[in-house]
Amino acid sequence: MTLATPNHIVRPAKDLDEVQDLYWPLMQELGWNRAKEDCKTHYTVSKSWLLIFPESCKTPQGMLLPLIYPNKTAWVAFFIMNAAYRGKGLGAALWREMETLVSAAQCSFIGLDAVPEQVQTYTRRGFVDCARVPLMSRKSLVEKPLGIKWGYEDAVELQDLRDVDPVYLTQLDLEHTGLDRRAYWAANVLPARRDAFGYTIVEDGELTGLIYARRCPDGVRIGPLFAATYAQARQLLHKLMNDYARMEGTFAAEIFGTNTEGRKLFEELGWEYAGVSYHRMWKDGKVPEEQKEGSMGATGMYATFDAASG
């Protein structure tokens, strides 16, 4: 017997508070280790954070964030329902609205990072499992000091990420991911977060590497990490970790599994596999060139930014 979907309304959030009042309790319930400030970041970037209101409710009971980037790529995130409203067809209503928006934007690539339990759900919706994104974690340097030392004969000069024109941050990101995330790298968004900072590498006037980190409930989340060489990736990660030398809590990062050196790098600095990997899935198996085997992403993206945005 098929149950009827309750009457409902799907619409974009009116303001940040409307999203955050649903987002924050769900993040705590699911243990996704995302900060309140992350919600503000994604809301600022997205023009259509979708919420669903069952007829009997004055507050939203589910959400879905479709991120539509300027280069006709899209990312699907935060597809979540409150427990009492799961299994009633409301998620399908949210999904249809997302598909309408993505179709209207004529997106060529649509991706998402799925938790293992949801892979079959997305497979039925036409997504193909194309890569893994292992979650890595590390105890603080207070609890577990760095046990490795090396010379810096080949070290390069690092610059504060905020001193680099967002146009160049966007371009380096695009070259590694195929996603045009200029709205994230705008001066008033990621670079402006008070709970975050990062470093870049500029060689011969060209931006070749960057690392970014932000606070999360359990400690600090690192990513993205792009670098032209393993040595430079190690220098960026080592520097950033040392800047959090007195931090309590843990480090977290999402590793781009297609880069075989990514996990090795983090393990060299004392990180461990957290026991779970996201499944990077693409609609109809269409993967941006920048993330395929042998691409710049496969050799230079050591950590992704966030499962919520690619």
Task: Identify the function of each model-found stretch.
Residues 23, 125-221:
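Amide-forming acyltransferase catalytic core, primarily the GNAT-like/NAT-type
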